[in-house]
Curated annotation (Swiss-Prot):
Zn(2+) binds at E135, H160, E164. The gene is zupT. Mediates zinc uptake. May also transport other divalent cations. PANTHER family: ZINC TRANSPORTER ZUPT, ZINC/IRON TRANSPORTER. Its main location: membrane. It is a multi-pass membrane protein. It comes from the Bacteria. It catalyses: Zn(2+)(in) = Zn(2+)(out). It is found in: Cell membrane. Fe(2+) binds at N132, E135, N161, E164, E193. InterPro entries: ZIP (IPR003689), Zn_transptr_ZupT (IPR023498). Belongs to the ZIP transporter (TC 2.A.5) family. ZupT subfamily. This is Zinc transporter ZupT.
Length: 264
């Protein structure tokens, strides 16, 4: 179990700290590659939707129906799934729209007063940190269940964290002229994912059993579906043409399907 815990934590940390990659990209380029971002974000959505509905949700249902009976376990699976959606939706609603990490800006759009830019960067970092808490727990729980499921999820979350890193670092860099400060705040916002995993695990450990574990696993599926539909797909559409986003989604589903088949 300790080996699984270590692996799950490392995977979660890698996903969260990819915000630092976004920060570095912001320093070396003056233009946002919208086509690449559109396809990449669509790809992330495809991976997360496919693995949630084809692998995580059925696995949660199997765990719960074995721990309970078929009817009760199936009902709890569905309730936990939509409970996960409700949780991330509430968190999303509590974040002001102007600071919401879903409202991603391109590098070219940041041109305001230094004080306002600094505040924007700091508030975005805080918002992303709050938003990344449940993502961290979702990645961690997936890693505990099966690393082969978690690795594609980590890649998908890492891809969608890159533009969030840009959203934090660009305004802070333009306000202060300090790459170190911009990178630090971007990096710290990503730490919320492994922190969310640690806090969530220690809170749940005293009550952990197959029913709780299965319910959390189903809620993880709900969280990832909501993130995909509410965040990744709209961002993919905003950055590029409609079909680029859809091609990205289909590619993500295909890669995820093949990777799961390889581990059968």
């Amino acid at each position: 179990m300790s080996q699984h815990l270590f692996t799950a934590f490392i995977l979660t940390a890698l996903a969260g700290l990819s915000t630092g990659i976004g920060s570095l990209i912001a320093f070396v380029t003056k233009h946002t590659n919208k086509t690449f971002l559109s396809v990449s974000l669509g790809f992330s959505a495809g991976v997360m939707i496919y693995v949630s509905m084809i692998e995580i949700f059925p696995t949660a249902q199997t765990i719960l129906t074995k721990a309970m009976d078929k009817k009760s376990g199936s009902w709890l699976t569905v309730l936990a799934f939509f409970g996960g959606i409700l949780l991330i939706a509430i968190i999303d609603k509590l974040i002001p729209s102007e600071e919401n990490p879903h409202e991603i800006k391109t590098i070219e759009e940041e041109d305001q007063k230094p004080t306002k830019l600094m505040r924007m960067g700091l508030m975005t970092a805080i918002a992303i940190g709050i938003h990344n808490f449940p993502e961290g727990l979702a990645t961690f729980i997936s890693g505990l269940q099966d690393a082969s499921i978690a690795i594609p999820i980590v890649i998908a979350i890492a891809i969608h964290n890159i533009p969030e890193g840009i959203a934090v670092s660009v305004p802070i860099y333009q306000a202060t002229g300090s790459k170190k400060k911009a990178f630090t705040y971007s990096f710290l916002s990503g730490l919320a994912e492994p922190l969310g995993a640690i806090i969530g695990w220690f809170l749940l450990m005293p009550i952990m059993n197959n029913i709780v574990y299965g319910a959390i696993f189903s809620a993880v599926a709900g969280i990832m579906v909501f993130i995909s539909l509410d965040e990744l797909l709209p961002a993919a559409e905003e950055y590029g043409k409609h079909h680029l986003a859809i091609y990205g989604v289909i590619s993500g589903m295909l890669i995820m399907a093949v990777s799961l088949l390889l581990f059968i």
